[in-house]
Amino acid sequence: MNTISLNELDSENTFYHFTSRDNHESISLNGLIPSIGDNANGIEKTSKVFFSKGNIGFLRICDVWINWFIYRISLYNSVLKYKDITKEERMNLKRKFREDFTNGLYYTEDNINYAIAWMIEYMKSNIVLKLDITSEEYDPFDTDEAKSHEKEEFTNRMYLGYITSSDKVESFNMHTKSGVGVDKNKISKVTTNDDDSALSILKEIYKEEKDKDNGLEFAFLDRFMNYVNSMDENIKL
């Protein structure tokens, strides 16, 4: 697989795909195979390859992932940890949980801190790929199946308000056409200063975009980056 330096990329139009470092060899041989993610069963109807467009799309999907981790943590503590309950009781618990999550009742210090720690490990174990795909392989106005599956209020909460359409894909959460993968020759691994971890790529992109626009704000990513940068400062000391 070819590598490309982050500073060579178009900050507005590059297509970024995240994947586990463990997948590098397989992707180098076979490209990206479309799939339905573990967290999308029952939501996505067809297999796809997901990606984010541009640096802002990259940062927004990271922000949304932190929120998703908060959701997962809260769901376990509110519903999934209870094993000896009936199906009806579990459904009622989950219904109440989703209502409360939509209303923002689970953004506690403990949940946010846990999600930040989870996100750090996730980003350390991932790499970032640049996809050289064309309109033959994706539709910028394709349907976001998660939006059509969920209530608008819940989707808006999960996407942190980064919504421009009620049913179309957003720049931070785009995908290939159904059943379409990405050929290995259209994939490059992104590096910065010879470092390929997604966390290092995130640091550079975040700094670059903040330098351009100091008023740029994120729901959870700002706090995440403050924590990561403070860890880096402590290491230097």
What spans do the regions from the language model cover?
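Short, well-ordered alpha-helical scaffold segment located
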Residues: 56-57, 114
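ADP-ribose/NAD+-binding catalytic cleft of ART/PARP-like enzymes
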Residues: 1-50, 57-103
